Regions:
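Glycine-rich phosphate/pyrophosphate-handling loop used in enzymes and phosphotransfer proteins
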Residues: 1-129
Length: 129
């Protein structure tokens, strides 16, 4: 009976890869094996204000943060804009709440040090523009 309880949800609501959205056996991963290498994470150096990847190590702020005032103290980013744009759009606007586990785990694994250092009062998603 316990096995049936685990199988039925997968039959009714098959798991989808958070990158390509294909139905896939991704138990615990969130992303299929063919898509895992396609994810591009932002690496250092990063903007000290918003977290965008910078071209040069000696830069402190990106072009946008150098020129504009923002209404937040510090931000961070996980993915390069292009690699996960469609996935983030589906998650936010395409009724894919099942991606939340993948995004939450990925954020925790990759940005745990930052989050522990900053101790944010809230994690706020940014609108896609």
């Amino acid at each position: 009976m316990i096995q049936l309880q685990k199988i039925i949800p997968d039959l009714l609501f098959p798991r989808r890869c958070a990158v390509c959205d294909d139905i896939s056996d991704i138990r615990g991963q969130g992303v299929c094996s063919k898509c895992q290498p396609r994810i591009v994470y932002i690496k250092e150096p990063c903007c000290m204000k918003c977290g965008k990847q910078l071209a040069r190590q000696e830069q402190e702020y990106c072009r946008d943060c150098s020129r504009n005032k923002h209404f937040f103290i510090k931000g961070t980013a996980l993915y390069d804009q292009g690699s996960m744009a469609e996935s983030v759009f589906r998650f936010k606007y395409g009724n894919r709440p099942e991606y939340a586990r993948f995004y939450g785990r990925d954020l925790y694994e990759k940005k745990r040090g930052f989050l522990e250092q900053v101790k944010p009062d809230a994690l706020v998603p940014v609108p896609i523009h």
